[in-house]
Structures are given as C-alpha cells and as structure tokens.
UniProtKB/Swiss-Prot annotation:
Main location: mitochondrion
Gene that encodes it: MORF3
GO-annotated molecular function: cobalt ion binding; protein dimerization activity
Name of the molecule in the record: Multiple organellar RNA editing factor 3, mitochondrial
Family to which this protein belongs: Belongs to the MORF family.
InterPro entries: MORF/ORRM1/DAG-like, MORF/ORRM1/DAG-like_MORF, S8pro/Inhibitor_I9_sf
C-alpha cells in the first residue's frame, strides 16, 4: 500500500510539472502529450529507487481493488479491471492504448512508420484489415506511435513485440472534446491534423530583422564652413616677438 501511495504522489507531481511546462502556449496542444508518459516515468523512478539500496515493503498479491492492474500480474484475471476512480488521466479506459515505437537510424519516412504500426498490430490480431480498423490515430512527429482500440490482454502481447517501447492506456489531449490527438487513421487512410503536430521549425520563433532609424537615413548632413570673420588664422611667429 505504501508503494501504491508513493506512485500516486509521484504521478500527481509529474502531471503538474509536465502540464505547467506547456501552459505558456495554448497554440501547441501537442506538448500536453508529455503527460501521457507519466506512467513509465513512475516506473523508472520506482526501479531506480530500489536499485540504490535495500528497500523492503510489505506487500501481498492482489487480484482486485484499488491499485491492481493485470499488466503487473504474472497470472492476470482479465475480468477484474481497476476502478475508474483510480485512473489519473481523463480518457484512460484500458481499451484505448497508446503504443510508442522506436526506430533506428536512418529514420524511416512517415509512410514507412505507419506501415510498421499496421504490421505490429497485425502480428497480434492476425489480420491486416482488422488492424487498420483498430488503429484510430497515428503520429510520426511529436512521438512515433499509434493509438489502438484493443483489449488489455492484447496490449500485453503488443508490449512484447520488437520495436515497441511503451504500451500505455491512452488519454485525452483535448479533454472537452474527448480527443486523443494525433493524425486520424480511418480505414487505412491518414487524415492529417496540423494542430497536433509539433516540429522544431514551428516551435522556433523567427529571428527579428534589424531595425533601422529611417530618420537617420533620410537626414541630410549639414556641413558647416568655418567663418572667416570670427576667427583669423594665427601666425606662429607672433608668439616669438619680444614684448615692448
């Protein structure tokens, strides 16, 4: 129970940190997708904490109730799902899954990435056409992954596939509209949505042009001639004359 409480606290802090780092601009909703990765960060924090030294926590296996998930159960009971009150992010229903993949250099094209997404899901469903129907979103810019409407049991099988980095319960990027974000994927066709794409070129502000003072460019320089009447040239020899 202590570990569960710690993970909840860490999740809350991570969500606040990730959301605050993106609140400066509402025009880039893709940045809020970082909150999706709070759960694997919790796992990394937990694993790094236990590797620093002995940490003994009295626990017992659970098959239901708060804090239980078949994802962490070696012998899962798929009929027992965690209560929705324990879900931290809106949209997490353990039916919509975010599958994040990693690609080696040289980085493949967008089309090659999407084909890889379909191939990955096909390997567990056994049918390419069925896989195309189950994929509801794809992304090749902000992150490399896709959203799939599959069971929790199948999500565990996907997690074991090569090239799969994370498999997480998906969450809304646009909570009021219940939108998971990314480019839509409908029957094998990609429907681009620029508002969910984030690139360095888009994020970088253009450098301001140098400013010039037009008044200085158009102002005529007045050259003043020396006045002959006011100041007469001085003969150096006059300073050497003896005084009378």
């Amino acid at each position: 129970m202590a570990l569960i409480s710690t993970r909840r606290t860490l999740s809350t802090l991570l969500n606040k940190t990730l959301s605050s780092s993106t609140s400066y601009s509402s025009s880039f909703p893709t940045l809020s997708s970082r909150s999706r990765f709070a759960m694997p960060l919790i796992e990394k924090v937990s694993s790094s904490r236990t590797s620093l030294g002995p940490c003994y926590i009295s626990t017992r296996p659970k098959t239901s109730g708060s804090g239980y998930s078949p994802l962490n159960d070696p012998s899962p009971n798929w009929s027992n799902r965690p209560p929705k009150e324990t879900i931290l992010l809106d949209g997490c229903d353990y039916e919509h899954w975010l599958i994040v993949m990693e690609f080696t250099d040289p980085k493949p094209t967008e089309e090659e990435m999407i084909n890889s997404y379909v191939k990955t899901l096909t390997s567990v469903l056994g049918c390419e056409e069925e896989a195309k129907k189950k994929i509801y979103s794809v992304c090749t810019s902000t992150y490399t992954g896709f959203g799939a409407l599959i069971s929790e049991e199948l999500s565990c099988k996907v997690k074991a596939l090569p090239g799969v980095l994370w498999v997480l319960p998906d969450s809304y990027l646009d909570v009021p509209n219940k939108d998971y974000g990314g480019d839509l994927y409908v029957e094998g066709k990609v429907i681009p949505r620029p508002q969910y794409r984030f690139t360095e070129q888009r994020h970088t502000r253009p450098r301001p042009r140098p400013r010039y003072d037009r008044r200085r460019e158009t102002m005529q320089v007045e050259r003043r001639e020396p006045s002959m009447g006011l100041h007469s040239p001085v003969n150096p020899g006059e300073f050497n004359k003896p005084s009378a």
